[in-house]
Structure formats: structure tokens, C-alpha cells
Amino acid sequence: DWHLLELEGEDGDRHRALKAFFQAVNAFYLAHPELWELDFSWEGFEWIEADDNQANTIAFLRKDKKGSTLVTVCNFSPVDRTGYTIGVPTAGTYTCLFSTDDPAFGGLGRGDAGPVKSQYIECHGRGQAITLSLPPMSAAIYKCTRKFPSRRKKSAEAAPKAAKSDKAAK
């Protein structure tokens, strides 16, 4: 079937894009131990959303032994899902590392144009969430590339400071 890569026009372009996709996904897989290091353990996998049959989407986490986490979101419907919100484990900025809608793979390059910042809202049992644009029939993998300070840490630090200021006022 290698002769299909030599076809001219749209058919050849599709086959070359598919080849580029498999080369990229294999390289991505090897470069990200979150996808394979704990492959046979529930410690390496966690559902975010497994039951959204109305939107035909799923979302899950993959983790490595060091605790590094990737967020995968799949849209199995032929409809754009703009404003799709999922809970995430860490407050911060999330960057799309891999998208099946990439033009290099024959996609249209839709989805999130840049990094997405989490918001402190409850979603899927987590205290923070990101809102994404999911192209139809696509999957995307995100990673928290910049963590925000914990809200709990700030309130825990504020209590001793408040106690000190109360003593100083007396």
C-alpha cells in the first residue's frame, strides 16, 4: 500500500497526512511516559468524564510515576463543542500538546488557539476547570504548563498572619 503515498491530488494528500499523523502520534507516545509508564495500573489512569453521551465526549487523565499528568479529551460527534468545560486536577495554564485536527494530519486546525487558563469552579468533582473548543470528530491532549498558587495555601497562610495582627493590635 506504500504506492498510495505517491498518488497525486487529494487522494495522495490524504494518505500522506495519515502517514504524518501516525509518525507524530508514535513519537508523541514515546516522548510522554504518562501514556505508557503505568499502563497496567489504575494509578496511571483516571476518568474525568465517561458518561457524557449527550455530547458524545469523554475526558480522562494519564499519569506517570513522577505524577506528571496529561488530560485527554475526545469529541466523537460531528458537531463543534465550543465552551466545553471539564474539571482538571491542577489549577493553572493548560497547553494543547497534540490535536488530531492539526492541518498536518488533514485537519482544519480548529480548537483552542493558545493556552487555556483554569478557573476556580467546581466541575467533575474538582475545584478547578478548563473550558475548551473541541472540533468535531477529534481528540486533543493537554498538559498543565504553568501551575497557579493553591487557593487553600493562600487561606492557610492568611490565618497565621491574621492571628499575628490581632496580637499586635492588643
Question: Could you say what each language-model-derived stretch is?
Answer:
Residues D1-K170:
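Carbohydrate-interacting/catalytic domains
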